[in-house]
Amino acid sequence: MQPTATAAAIPSGITLATTTPTGQTIPVAIGTRCFALGGTLAAILNKPDGSGIYGLIVADAAHDVTGEWGEYGQNVPNAKGPDGAANTQAMLAAGSPIAQAVRALNIEGHADWFIPSRLQMLALYESVPDLFDKDSWYWTSSQYSRYPAWCQDFEYGISTAGSKDYSFRARPVRSIQLQPFTPSQLPQPIAEGDPRAILGAEVAA
């Protein structure tokens, strides 16, 4: 039976935000295009350890990597969990060519890209299938056994095992921290006559 990817439950009326590398707090929602973060917020998930939630940023299709999963006939024991970043690191250590290509990416100053796990990929299918090519198969970072690894279809949502020596696409993603957001966190407009309007925002109110 195919597992179900359960998105994080966000209480009614709660807005989420993240912080950019420059320290700016920005509200986000599924489908938000975040140039400063390298792509589109595509899923909001519970952390595997239950310590909170996180968001998955999906890179544009132009950054897709195509190739073999690698390590055909080899067991990669640490590439079976729900954390795509940890799986990708295990693939990298084993010599996977697509893991090497994804980890070498630098998009908008971010170099922490990874291949999503099977569960993360299922969440992407549930939330943003239109960001993926319906005629392509996409590798996940989740190994099935020594010979196949899990791959994902975005036309019918099929998650199946494909031979590691097949050449499929891999979509880079990265994770971001999310926190509750209130409008007061946004920079407030400077009123007319405020000294900061003349001397600069660094002047104390």
What residue ranges belong to the model's regions?
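Short acidic (Asp/Glu) patches
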Residues: 35-43, 95-99, 154-157
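Short aromatic-cysteine micro-motif
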Residues: 45-114, 118-119, 124-127
